[in-house]
Amino acid sequence: CQMAADLGADRVINAAEEDPVAAVRKLTNGSGAHLVVYAVGGPAGPRAFEQGLDMLGVDGTLHLVGLYEDEPLSLPSSKIQRRRVLGGYYGQRIGLSSYRRAMQLLASGQVNAERMTTHRFDYTESAAAFDLLWNHPGDALGVLLEWDR
């Protein structure tokens, strides 16, 4: 959470200290979020997905980019009426323009990826990198595989 604040977040919500759904509802005066990006991996996935749906306001979008354990995600019809749930992160037209914009933000220095990189692995150690991300998601923020070390 401290890194999010250091990188310019207007408000940081620590789900270990407060109910994230209630916090988002309070911040939006009860109307809910326009966009929730679900980028959670590992065993927290299904619960975070449910919370993401609960944070959405009418006509809001939940964008799924995280991977989780092989459990079905609950999609109650009452929670998805007048809301959008988008899955995927590559290969869609909107995805390509998003990548282009992300590269522009990185190149201009508006996004400091170096601060968000917590671990670097040689590509030959990719199994260890994925183990860290999957089994210890709270210990890593950004993990890079390097080919030219």
Predicted segments, located by residue:
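Active-site PLP-lysine loop of aminotransferase-like
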Residues: G88-R93
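Glycine-rich cofactor phosphate-binding loops and adjacent beta1-alpha1 units
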Residues: Q2-V85
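Conserved beta-strand scaffold positions in the cores of enzyme catalytic domains, especially
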Residues: V12, V85-G87, M116, R120
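C-terminal hydrophobic helical "lid"/dimerization subdomain
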Residues: D19, P46, E50-L53, V58, ...
